Amino acid sequence: PNADKVVTNDPMEATYVGMHMWKQAVEKAKTTDVDKVIEAMGGQKFKAPCGFELTMDKTNHHLHKPVMIGEIRGDGQFNVVYKTKGPIRAQPWSPFIAGNESKQKI
C-alpha cells in the first residue's frame, strides 16, 4: 500500500549500495576473509538507485557520489535545485576542522 508515495533517502541508498559493493568484493576476492575483501573493495563501481554509477575510491574507500542541493517543499520532500553532472570524489578530511591539516592529503 502507498508504494507510489515511498521515497528513499541517502542513508537507505548508502546501505543498499554498501551491501552490494561488499557482495561484489567477496565475489572478486573469492573469500570472506576480511583483508582480502578490503583489498577487493577499491575501484568497484555500482549503479545506485539515484541513477548514478558510484565508484569506491582505491585509496580511502570513500564513495565518489553526486552532490545535490534541494529545497524543502511543504510536504517534506525536496525539489533538487542543483545537481552535479556526475559523481564527485570524496574529501575524507574536512579542512574546516582543526587538526585535519596534518592528515593525509588525497
Place the predicted regions along the sequence by residue.
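Extracytosolic ligand-binding ectodomains
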Residues: 1-106
